[in-house]
Amino acid sequence: MNGLGGLNKSPEGVVIGLVQLQLPNVVTRADLARQTERIVWMVGKARRNLSTMDLVVFPEYSLHGLSMDTNPEIMCRLDGPEVTAFKKACVDNRIWGCFSIMEFNPHGNPYNSGLIIDDHGEIKLYYRKLHPWIPVEPWEPGDIGIPVIEGPKGARIALIICHDGMFPEMARECAYKGAEIMIRTAGYTAPIREAWRFTNQANSFQNLMVTANVCMCGSDGSFDSMGEGMIVNFDGAVLAHGTTGRADEIITAEVRPDLVREARINWGVENNIYQLWHRGYVAVKGGAMDCPYTFMQDMVAGTFRLPWEDQVKVTDGSSCGFPAPTRMYGKTAKAAE
């Protein structure tokens, strides 16, 4: 059930549009300005495409492309012209929007950040990618956790970025904090296609949570991104899937946060996020409420260590042309000098 891509919208439905944006090549400030205009135009296209659409989602790297360029001249700020333009586009088109920026960081490497802006032009969600795609990406690891907001129709929404979604703990954190819809934006290329598909479905099923996932699309002359917009229902069933690889196509579906809430309350079999803390409640009252997972205990204690830790060969970005870092997490670049 997806309401024919949102054409037939139910009273409780939220219609999401995933933009499989053509992969750009952004090097200069002028390139950045042109790509900003392109995204603004696509917000308008989304509204013209489907009058029922509540939220339009742009992929990771939609503004900067896949070059991994950390040049401060093309990094964004929350009060900069790019974000200002996105805010205006949401107001002008009466639509919520999810956008990607590479954000200037005066204390270290840039952040890979995501924003959700409402139809009044207000930033409602601001997230910094927790898990950069190492060793390929140079971005500073995020430091503000995973926010969950109230979006269109009161839907509880979270945002994660690309590689984040390969960690089941990320989707679990979103759901634990109440998210009914988890957005996953990405710049992934074709070698990740199958992992992209099954993790999107697993993230939904394991948490009784809708996921809306989209990559960049097309080629910039060096890289080929795959599109693969996927909207997955809370039971893991795919509601909509962009399989043609057609750049600038908008994949749409209606999702039902009210049915997510209903399932979380009423499901017995496979209500996994509840049962995680209530193991074996048939045998013991309330189930076992403990933490039998060694890795969780060790992370909290700061002693997480793999049995093969000392054998791991790739532990910095030097294989991808980045200098080995000397600064520890939590220390500013200036303090490390």
Swiss-Prot record:
One of its GO terms (biological process) is putrescine biosynthetic process from arginine. InterPro entries: Aliph_Amidase/BUP (IPR050345), C-N_Hydrolase (IPR003010), C-N_Hydrolase_sf (IPR036526), Formamidase (IPR022843). Keywords: Hydrolase. It comes from the Bacteria. One of its GO terms (molecular function) is N-carbamoylputrescine amidase activity. Residues 14-257 form the CN hydrolase domain. Its EC number is 3.5.1.49. Belongs to the carbon-nitrogen hydrolase superfamily. Aliphatic amidase family. NCBIfam families: PRK13287.1. This is Formamidase. The gene is amiF.
